């Protein structure tokens, strides 16, 4: 059962500087207040990084600073040998929400993206997993609360909208919006088949029951289908 949450809470940065997130919209605050009034599930946010030191330096602190009325952890899975990424993670390692692990260099003949997601999910302490790309940043400190308030007992998947930054070209922003609107419509009709993976929640038990990417780990692409 799928709950689609169509709200531009996530903004993907395309060659742009950080925006000022000091102010939030009334609708966002209202949703956050509703979330604080209910029992929120524990959430594990999984971020898979590949040469994303700059993006993590810019966006990871915003993820760690989420105002969430429940327990949450942030799991970053990076590649061993990426010294810049490791340095960023070490600088933020004092944060109680952060946990990171490294993929061994020997795992070359398989999809490293799928392997990273699998490792992150297995390391998660929570039933609910949030998949996030390192190039994405929350548009407010209530992003996680607004997403997680949809994690009800009768749902296994929560799909959120993510958009390009305002500095991206118009046709790029339109194309992304069009594709996601189509994907969300299919999900609402119980025919979810793909997502960008940048703002997606799934139950760990479901992922493990389906054995994750076991049958397609040797295929480089397809992690979002």
Could you say what each language-model-derived stretch is?
Residues 86, 90, 113-122:
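Short, conserved alpha-helix that lines the donor NDP-sugar binding/gating region
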């Amino acid at each position: 059962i799928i709950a689609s949450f169509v709200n531009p809470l996530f903004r993907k940065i395309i060659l742009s500087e950080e925006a000022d997130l000091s102010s939030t919209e009334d609708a966002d605050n209202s949703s956050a207040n509703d979330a604080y009034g209910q029992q929120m599930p524990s959430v594990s946010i999984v971020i898979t990084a590949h040469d994303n030191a700059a993006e993590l330096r810019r966006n990871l602190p915003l993820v760690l600073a989420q105002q969430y009325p429940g327990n949450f952890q942030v799991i970053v899975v990076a590649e061993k040998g990426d010294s810049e990424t490791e340095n960023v993670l070490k600088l933020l390692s004092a944060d109680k929400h952060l946990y990171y692990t490294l993929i061994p260099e020997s795992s070359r003949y398989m999809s490293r993206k799928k392997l990273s997601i699998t490792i992150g999910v297995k390391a998660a302490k929570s039933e609910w997993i949030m998949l996030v790309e390192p190039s994405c940043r929350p548009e407010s400190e209530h992003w996680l609360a607004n997403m997680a308030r949809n994690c009800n007992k009768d749902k296994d998947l929560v799909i959120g909208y993510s958009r390009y930054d305002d500095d991206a070209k118009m046709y790029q922003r339109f194309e992304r919006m069009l594709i996601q609107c189509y994907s969300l419509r299919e999900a609402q009709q119980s025919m979810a088949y793909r997502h960008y993976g940048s703002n997606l929640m799934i139950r760990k038990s479901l992922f493990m029951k389906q054995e994750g990417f076991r049958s397609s780990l040797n295929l480089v692409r397809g992690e979002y289908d």
